[in-house]
Amino acid sequence: MVERRNPLVLSSTRSTLRSVLNSSQPSSADGDRVLNKDGDLLRGNARLSAGILRWRKDGENVSDAKLDSLDDSALVGLSTQLLKRLSINSGSLVVVKNIEIGIQRVAQVVVLDPPKTTLEDASLTQVPVSDSLHTMLVFPTYDLMGQQLLDQEVAYLSPMLAFNLSLHISCLKSLVHRGNGVLEKYFEAKCDEEFIGKSAEDGSKIGLDLEPVSQVPGYASHLRVSFVKIPECGTIPSLKVNSSFEAEERQGLIDSALQKYFGTDRQLSRGDIFRIYIDWNCGSSICNPCSQRLCSESDDYIYFKVIAMEPSNERFLRVNHSQTALVLGGTVSSGLPPDLLVYRSKVPMPLQEETVNILASVLSPPLCPSALASKLRVAVLLHGIPGCGKRTVVKYVARRLGLHVVEFSCHSLLASSERKTSTALAQTFNMARRYSPTILLLRHFDVFKNLGSQDGSLGDRVGVSFEIASVIRELTEPVSNGDSSMEEKSNSNFSENEVGKFRGHQVLLIASAESTEGISPTIRRCFSHEIRMGSLNDEQRSEMLSQSLQGVSQFLNISSDEFMKGLVGQTSGFLPRDLQALVADAGANLYISQESETKKINSLSDDLHGVDIHQASQIDNSTEKLTAKEDFTKALDRSKKRNASALGAPKVPNVKWDDVGGLEDVKTSILDTVQLPLLHKDLFSSGLRKRSGVLLYGPPGTGKTLLAKAVATECSLNFLSVKGPELINMYIGESEKNVRDIFEKARSARPCVIFFDELDSLAPARGASGDSGGVMDRVVSQMLAEIDGLSDSSQDLFIIGASNRPDLIDPALLRPGRFDKLLYVGVNADASYRERVLKALTRKFKLSEDVSLYSVAKKCPSTFTGADMYALCADAWFQAAKRKVSKSDSGDMPTEEDDPDSVVVEYVDFIKAMDQLSPSLSITELKKYEMLRDQFQGRSS
């Protein structure tokens, strides 16, 4: 049965109503109507949960005229039952209070009729919060254009009203108290729809008090507003111009937008933030941050802050351009709403999710008002190799928290006098305070490790470091409750809770560096947290490449999955910056190729009259796809060359088992060590220490290096080759640092094989080197420390060493857990073994029919190594090439069966080459290596 509406009480019936209700006792229950001292009817209060109200201006169900009449900065949506409970109508004004913080604002009520529900079906009108959409994990969300059910115990606020009530602070505080797991989900969120079905605990609800306004606020006679400073552009949007004419035009757009905005009554208070929409584009060639900014819903909004209103003794006032004189001028610092609060964010979460979660857990608590947070000093040192995405992570976290980001390069802070560096650093903090609350991002912070190096005095270096540390420590302290800015003091009508919004941590310091090594301990102690960022793993690279290549995958002549798998394997160790450069390079080459192919098709269609251009494009379709793949491969090769370093860049060699002749026993032993942990990781998940080190020893030229490359190729591993002398440096500590860098580079390119060639020169027995500084002893100790960390089954890192003299290597490297698997790679006197080696070396040769590799192998000396047989094959091919050149010079005409570009190697060429070649090993030397094999045979396993 439909409930009867309450009678409308008019002023003329006041005396009659007083006489009727004079004998009744007024009720104090929430939601009941009571009488004030004058006998007027009072409407009840309501305590509700906070929600977010959204609508799309391009929707089909609501006209633009109706949307324009709504005050999006002060709007609250209620159900019909709540309107009856409060005895108000749609369009009435209510006072909304954040119970936790105590901030109050006046808002206009709009009724939200539940779609697809009727009053007869009362059970459907009560929908739990957990079954609705959620904003910021906490706020139930209602979309005017949607068809979801309505929660009867929720007041749905417009995003700007929620921000002015500091509900985002209450939400963040709730998430922090619920633990890091919930906080991580908040920073992973991309849109409201991700939280369908998420349970909302009772403790996570944000409480509101709603009270009908007994008297409509009066009009403000004067209103003063200022632009909110945005450090990304360095200035307000109206000044992002190239000429005075353009500046006047843009200022006119802002004035007209404000005139239209205040064409309807707006409920404002001092300190409120409101925004206007202007459809424009910066277009300035000097504004790089604007040109690089992602396109999103918030780019066309300009934010303003209410500085002063008249009359000043009124807390809430109405503003209308026909009743209020508007003064616009200056800029002011203020935070902006978090991106998830005001719109559905289109910015994807960075690939380094772990770093995002750690940084969020550090920066979120200081933003929550509490006695403990106001005493904590927060400063973060974020370090990682250049291009790993440090700035991207910082900006993403700042958007989620509603903070500005002010960037400075520490190179610009280094003055001619190092004593002035601390002064320049203090000025950057003062600059950042102009945009508070903000994150001050000091890039290239590791330049401070060179302070005082010119003077060379230890006392001067300590003094400069102490000055830098004093500035950081002093300026990262939170503002005490006794401190306040001039702006806060002038706004004496603010409540104590509202003033508290502008105190606390005005500037949060984040310093980014490539490495923390070399930075003075005095400076490092100023940072409360140090966070390290690594490189991308296979899944992260695959995700980034998939997103980047969505538009060009149709041009590739192989399936997307197959191409992506190979590309991910070839980009091991690539950073986000490297991947972006790779895709940009390939895209530029692909565009040029497509342009040239289009010209060919057009010329072909002109020559073939009557043939359609589409048909002509089908003729050359396969060529286009092949060209696109080749362009991408070339871009990958160029990218690898750019990333190559002095110590060698990780790469995947192109050496197959077919290139290695013989050595079947050694192949099997290496595969058991390397391939088994990769294919069956579950077997090693129980904590068993895997054997990840192999030492190949034997005479030179027996194929130790070739064997290591073949293992890396067949197991799809990256290959990092290290020559011993490359790591030795004359400066103290640099050699050990080079060893650490090698293992760090390999970890970033996992799965990876580190190949130490000539290991005996890099890690000789300690105490026997005789160098005055003990450099080699420290290098060996550093290698032992790094290798001991490879036993973890999750490392996917393997080490292979090669040496001619294993007896010179430090014995500690040969114990189990390090280079514990010793494999002898020697010379085999069996003719069939040498035949397999010759087949591998000549598999790309064009041999004559009279060539018998077994006969050639039998004629080879018994001390021939793999290198000797490679020289034999190379000399034989050279003999055949000279014979072909001689025939060409003599004028002999080749037969039809002969290929003019091929060289045919005959049996006699091998014999001539063998006569001119002597073995690289003698019988005596070979016996010495066999004695070494017998000595270490007991350690072989």
Curated annotation (Swiss-Prot):
Enzyme Commission number(s) from the entry: 3.6.4.-
One term under GO cellular component: cytosol
One Pfam family per UniProt: AAA
Binding-site positions, ATP: 384-391, 698-705
InterPro entries linked to this entry: AAA+_ATPase (IPR003593), AAA_ATPase_domain (IPR050168), ATPase_AAA_core (IPR003959), ATPase_AAA_CS (IPR003960), P-loop_NTPase (IPR027417), RecA-like_PEX6_r2 (IPR047533)
GO biological process terms held by the UniProt record: fatty acid beta-oxidation; protein import into peroxisome matrix
EC category: hydrolase
Signal peptide: none
MF-aspect GO terms: ATP binding; ATP hydrolysis activity
Subcellular location: Cytoplasm, Cytosol; Peroxisome membrane
Keyword hit for Hydrolase: yes
Alphabetical keyword list: ATP-binding, Cytoplasm, Hydrolase, Membrane, Nucleotide-binding, Peroxisome, Peroxisome biogenesis, Protein transport, Transport
Transmembrane segments: none
Annotated catalysed reactions: ATP + H2O = ADP + phosphate + H(+)
Function: Component of the PEX1-PEX6 AAA ATPase complex, a protein dislocase complex that mediates the ATP-dependent extraction of the PEX5 receptor from peroxisomal membranes, an essential step for PEX5 recycling. Specifically recognizes PEX5 monoubiquitinated at 'Cys-11', and pulls it out of the peroxisome lumen through the PEX2-PEX10-PEX12 retrotranslocation channel. Extraction by the PEX1-PEX6 AAA ATPase complex is accompanied by unfolding of the TPR repeats and release of bound cargo from PEX5. Required for jasmonate biosynthesis.
Quaternary structure and partners: Interacts with PEX1; forming the PEX1-PEX6 AAA ATPase complex, which is composed of a heterohexamer formed by a trimer of PEX1-PEX6 dimers. Interacts with APME9.
Similarity annotation: Belongs to the AAA ATPase family.
Protein name: Peroxisomal ATPase PEX6
